[in-house]
Regions:
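Conserved C-terminal helix/tail region of periplasmic/extracytoplasmic solute-binding proteins
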Residues: 300-335
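N-terminal signal peptide c-region/cleavage motif recognized by signal peptidases
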Residues: 21-24
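Pocket-lining segment of extracytoplasmic ligand-binding domains
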Residues: 172-264
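Ligand-binding "clamshell"
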Residues: 94-106, 195-209, 267, 288
């Protein structure tokens, strides 16, 4: 079993290592590689399946699935991945704080109700007696949005996490262990979260989390160097994503669902249900003060400072203004 502090040290050291190698970025001019999540349906997967990205940007697009945003950071550091679609903010902050030169260029999705922690049903623990979680065993994907949400919820309920046995587990593995009765509380997102809920209950709803300042959204992230060398390609990529969001918001949603479901590895019913809990900001909304116009930068700083306070990372940046670049999205808006 891995303690929280051991996991934190492992994540921090790993990210410091990848920060030292990110300068080895290599890009094949005829192909780019994009990281994404399975069981995480989004409208742009219609374009992924139909190769609309390839047609728009003029190069082959290879899609590689990941289990967590921390792995996306490592892949971008090594140069194996140029774009990560729907990377969680906490793993981005951990990598950026360690010195990796990444940037947020687009808000992929907002989803307060599709990332959460679930308590084992027979414990009969809810928000009225959450303090009883002390001493219990938890499965949490360290360094991710779910980890951030877990720590914020435990802080809210006054739960001393030092008394808990916390295992670093990706959502799919956590859901399986939870189903077998090996964990008391488990955290995750997407399809794994749905499976977790079959055996337990959440402590807070998405709306309740938002009131505590727990924002849950993902971003499209890139290697800064690669983006600067390929601005037109990146702008075209973001334009296709925005077009797919607009297409899904129109009357085309029904016809898109089967294609999205197949790409995401989920059935049509669960794909539709998941998408109903997602919000996809338009380009105009993303360029506003709420998002890339300042709100996102402030949230990055809040996450960084909180992780320092919790001992997850040794230090945060003075600010994360350089970690956000809206110029590519502004260019996409003109296409």
């Amino acid at each position: 079993m891995t303690s929280l502090n051991t996991s934190i040290r492992t994540v921090s050291l790993s990210l410091i290592f990848i920060a030292c190698i990110f300068h080895t970025q290599q890009t094949n001019a005829d192909q780019i590689t994009v990281g994404y999540f399975l069981e995480w349906p989004t409208p742009n997967q219609f374009a992924q399946s139909k190769k609309l990205y390839d047609k728009a940007i003029g190069v082959d697009v290879k899609w590689v699935s990941f289990d967590a945003g921390t792995a996306m950071s490592a892949a971008m550091a090594s140069g194996d991945v140029q774009i990560s679609f729907s990377q969680g903010i906490p793993p981005f902050v951990v990598a950026a704080s360690a010195g990796q030169d990444l940037q947020i260029v687009d808000i992929a999705v907002s989803y307060s109700d599709n990332e959460n922690c679930v308590v084992r049903e027979n414990l009969e623990i809810d928000k009225t007696n959450a303090k009883e979680l002390e001493g219990k065993q938890a499965g949490v994907p360290i360094g991710t949005a779910a980890h951030y949400g877990f720590l914020k919820q435990m802080q809210h309920f006054g739960v001393n996490t030092n008394t808990m046995k916390i295992v670093d587990m990706e959502p799919a593995a956590g859901a399986a262990a939870f189903a077998n009765g090996n964990l008391d509380i488990v955290c995750g997102w997407g399809g794994a979260l749905s499976r977790m809920k079959e055996h337990g209950n959440i402590l807070l709803t998405g709306t309740e989390k938002e009131k505590l300042g727990i924002q849950v959204f993902d971003a499209t992230t890139v290697s800064t160097q690669w983006a600067q060398e390929n601005p037109e390609l990146l702008a075209k990529f973001l334009k296709v994503t925005a077009d797919m969001n607009a297409k899904y918001a129109s009357s085309d949603a029904t016809s898109m669902l089967p294609i999205i479901a197949e790409a995401a590895g989920t059935d049509i019913a669960s794909t539709k249900a998941t998408l109903q809990t997602f919000t996809f900001p338009t380009i105009k909304q993303q360029l506003s003060e709420q998002w890339l116009g300042g709100g996102t930068q402030r949230f990055l700083k809040n996450v960084g400072d909180f992780f320092v306070e919790q001992g997850t990372i040794p230090k945060a940046r003075k600010d994360y203004n350089s970690s956000v670049d809206s110029s590519y999205l502004e260019a996409a808006a003109k296409l």
